[in-house]
Swiss-Prot record:
Residues 447-459, 661-676, 683-697 have a biased composition (Basic and acidic residues). Its cofactor is Mg(2+). Phosphorylation of MAPT/tau by MARK1 could play a role in early steps of Alzheimer disease. Pathological aggregation of MAPT/tau to neurofibrillary tangles, filamentous structures consisting of paired helical filaments (PHFs), is one of the hallmarks of Alzheimer disease. Hyperphosphorylation by MARK1 could be the initial step for this abnormal aggregation of tau in Alzheimer disease and animal models of tauopathy. It comes from Homo sapiens. It comes from the Eukaryota. This is Serine/threonine-protein kinase MARK1. Residues 746-795 form the KA1 domain. Its main location: membrane. It catalyses: L-seryl-[protein] + ATP = O-phospho-L-seryl-[protein] + ADP + H(+); L-threonyl-[protein] + ATP = O-phospho-L-threonyl-[protein] + ADP + H(+); L-seryl-[tau protein] + ATP = O-phospho-L-seryl-[tau protein] + ADP + H(+); L-threonyl-[tau protein] + ATP = O-phospho-L-threonyl-[tau protein] + ADP + H(+).
Length: 795
């Protein structure tokens, strides 16, 4: 282990005071005075009118909401000085209790000291009296979870490339004496080059050798057996177990341990028996046996895992070794010169970098060192197109600026990055070589239009707040009780089966864990008031295409705790081999199976306690409080992930998988039926005529299934889509010429689903395709309605 980096520790059960981002006790945050620097003249090439009306936070122009939780929201934004895209997590501090604030600030402190190419970077922290803005790296490829759902299991070569990056990043955390404690497929993001980015350090903490931790953190399917037993732990060993579950999931497309309820899941984890698919190599199986070891003392360390044979196949000359953090580069004269032309003084640049202030100065320096955004025309923002900064008279309501940033880190390129490249790289609709200059006066973080939409949906759908999962890497907020809203499970893209997203909770330490886990009573979790963690957290860094926050989609209600009934399981007939038995041939598991009906192995609907991440402290505090956690969530093994364990296979998956392409989830607007949005009215046709025949669908680069493509005219395809939506009683709104925002189901029965349908053009082909993108709702409900619509479309 390397020299230990000083990190202020936070007692996980100390709730009397909360510590601010800089580590000082802060009963009341005093806003700082705005800078006295004079405004810089506008750049010649500047965007005016519409774009100047977009809301700003600091130097960031907010664009779309890509994640949403109870107490946080994640927005895609663009840094106006450099043009780089970032994810901004917006946390309402007034909704958090002292414990949650402590965890939030601890997360920020931890992220400031992490600088690894496979960990989401934190660029800037902007703090006001009521709100905390975390400006983070934007991972445009979405979550590994959604990638697996859409594409199925990875080949071992690809899984190895991803797993090497994951192990490198986690080992780096451990050598800095930081344990993540919430490693799962939902918290693993992909950047534009398909490299891993670990997100969501909301449950991370510092550990000290010899001092045990006792908080149960993590999603049950990924949780180590000692956590189910309520035992104290050192820290790294629980991450190692989670890595074993992740490796199994990457290679097989399903979870090694799952159950109909928490009791069954606990029993399976404590037995330590899991199925080995026939297609898994012996080397991979042997590696799993080093990771998924019941006795934490005998569990392999990550330094040992790095030397494993499977880890280094094809990399014999470059065996995986602990990551050595490069010396910070604070003397890049090219970047400094560019910043000087923007209006920054050299002294303030040096001061911000040397003292690691994580303010706008440091963020600008870091962002200049990152890959510039590319536009459809092939042009990118160059130094000649960068603009000078202008300081508006009022900025962020007397905000206190403190922002961390990460140095430019060389990307570790995935060995197989081209093999499964699917992310939608279509950039925002901004002309190439544009300079941003004038920053409009700070607007409200959320547009009035969005607020009106939220109110409208709440009115029409049983007073529920539509929550969309963010892709942020920011941390999950272990949140205080939300008194009012009830959020629908956040959005996640599922192309098939019911591989369910795991949410994050906190269970109190040993006493509460005894009730919740040792006795294996699932009701102890579903009935207990568990604080729902901001789902926006994980999505912070996640790509717009994937637009999901890595955290829970939560249904928080005020009132009595909710009892969740978990569906039963039917084991698939596909052949398998237990960890100790020989392999047996079976039908190819690569075939994804999806049916228009509910899948046969839906274990936990999304958001179920069993799929959620637990954090020990909250069960005890919240037993008398209304249930804030997400509703049930299906397991990875179920549905698409269960394809490795299920012999049945239909062709429907081919229709669905290709439709779930990562794309920025557009911020929802009116979901109710209106004459202007229904095909029964003649307005869509009139709109088509008015816009002219020259309008074309946007072109996306990804693989389409032939069953989702058509040579039909895009306008005719849109009419067919509206016709099928009407036939299935779906509400929708035409947000753009070829983009529909759709809603189906009943929020009171947890069946509400929101998604986008878009007609897109295939590059270099005279074909168009239909893109499905889930915004919110359970995987099963979304699969059912998406499959039904796909089958009924006559394209």
């Amino acid at each position: 282990m390397s020299a230990r980096t000083p990190l202020p520790t936070v007692n996980e059960r100390d709730t009397e005071n909360h510590t601010s981002v800089d580590g000082y006790t802060e009963p009341h945050i005093q806003p700082t005075k705005s800078s006295s620097r004079q405004n810089i003249p506008r750049c010649r090439n500047s965007i005016t009118s519409a774009t100047d009306e977009q809301p700003h936070i600091g130097n960031y122009r907010l664009q779309k909401t890509i994640g949403k939780g109870n107490f946080a929201k994640v927005k895609l934004a663009r840094h106006v000085l450099t043009g780089r895209e970032v994810a901004v997590k917006i946390i309402d501090k007034t909704q958090l209790n002292p414990t949650s604030l402590q965890k939030l600030f601890r997360e920020v402190r931890i992220m400031k000291i992490l600088n690894h190419p496979n960990i989401v970077k934190l660029f800037e922290v902007i703090e006001t009296e009521k709100t905390l803005y975390l400006v983070m790296e934007y991972a445009s490829g979405g979550e590994v979870f959604d990638y697996l759902v859409a594409h199925g299991r990875m080949k071992e070569k690809e899984a190895r490339a991803k797993f090497r990056q994951i192990v490198s990043a986690v080992q780096y955390c451990h050598q800095k004496y930081i344990v993540h404690r919430d490693l799962k497929a939902e918290n693993l993001l992909l950047d534009g080059d398909m490299n891993i980015k670990i997100a969501d350090f909301g449950f991370s903490n510092e550990f000290t050798v010899g001092n045990k931790l006792d908080t149960f953190c993590g999603s049950p399917p990924y949780a180590a057996p000692e956590l189910f037993q309520g035992k104290k732990y050192d820290g790294p060993e629980v991450d190692v177990w989670s890595l074993g579950v992740i490796l199994y999931t990457l290679v097989s497309g399903s979870l090694p341990f799952d159950g109909q309820n928490l009791k069954e899941l606990r029993e399976r984890v404590l037995r330590g028996k899991y199925r080995i698919p026939f297609y898994m190599s012996t080397d991979c199986e042997n590696l799993l046996k080093k990771l998924l070891v019941l006795n934490p003392i005998k569990r392999g360390s990550l330094e040992q895992i790095m030397k494993d044979r499977w880890m280094n196949v094809g990399h014999e000359e470059e065996e995986l070794k602990p990551y050595t953090e490069p010396d910070p580069d604070f003397n890049d004269t090219k970047r400094i010169d560019i910043m000087v032309t923007m209006g920054f003084a050299r002294d303030e640049i040096n001061d911000a970098l040397i003292n690691q202030k994580y303010d706008e100065v440091m963020a600008t320096y870091i962002l200049l060192g990152r890959k510039p955004p590319e536009f459809e025309g092939g042009e990118s923002l160059s130094s000649g197109n960068l603009c000078q900064r202008s300081r508006p008279s009022s900025d962020l309501n007397n905000s206190t600026l403190q922002s961390p940033a990460h140095l430019k880190v060389q990307r570790s390129i995935s060995a197989n990055q081209k093999q499964r490249r699917f992310s939608d790289h279509a950039g925002p609709s901004i002309p190439p070589a544009v300079s941003y200059t004038k920053r409009p006066q700070a607007n409200s973080v959320e547009s009035e239009q969005k607020e009106e939409w939220d109110k409208d949906v709440a009115r029409k759908l049983g007073s529920t707040t539509v929550g969309s999962k963010s892709e942020m890497t920011a941390s999950p907020l272990v949140g205080p009780e939300r008194k009012k809203s009830s959020t629908i499970p956040s959005n996640n893209v599922y192309s098939g089966g019911s591989m369910a997203r795991r949410n994050t909770y906190v269970c109190e330490r040993t006493t509460d864990r005894y009730v919740a886990l040792q006795n294996g009573k699932d009701s102890s979790l579903t009935e207990m008031s568990v604080s729902s963690i901001s789902s926006a957290g994980s999505s912070v860094a996640s790509a717009v295409p994937s637009a999901r926050p890595r955290h829970q989609k939560s249904m928080s209600t005020s009132g009595h705790p909710i009892k969740v009934t978990l569906p039963t399981i039917k084991d698939g007939s596909e052949a398998y081999r237990p960890g100790t038995t020989q392999r047996v041939p079976a039908a190819s598991p690569s075939a994804h199976s999806i049916s228009t009906a509910t899948p046969d192995r839906t274990r936990f609907p999304r958001g179920s306690s069993s799929r959620s991440t637990f954090h020990g402290e909250q069960l005890r505090e919240r037993r008398s409080v209304a249930y804030n956690g997400p509703p049930a969530s299906p397991s990875h093994e179920t549905g698409a992930f269960a394809h490795a364990r299920r012999g049945t296979s239909t062709g429907i998956i081919s229709k669905i998988t290709s439709k779930f392409v990562r794309r920025d989830p557009s911020e929802g607007e009116a979901s109710g039926r209106t004459d202007t949005s229904r095909s029964t009215s003649g307005e869509p046709k009139e709109r088509d005529k008015e816009e002219g025949k020259d309008s074309k669908p946007r072109s996306l680069r990804f693989t389409w299934s032939m069953k989702t493509t058509s040579s039909m005219d895009p306008n005719d395809m849109m009419r067919e889509i509206r016709k099928v939506l009407d036939a299935n009683n779906c509400d929708y709104e035409q947000k753009e010429r070829f983009l529909l925002f759709c809603v189906h189901g009943d929020a009171r029965q947890d069946s509400l689903v929101q998604w986008e349908m878009e007609v897109c053009k295939l590059p270099r082909l005279s074909l168009n395709g239909v893109r499905f993108k889930r915004i919110s709702g359970t995987s099963i409900a979304f699969k059912n309605i998406a499959s039904k619509i796909a089958n009924e479309l006559k394209l």
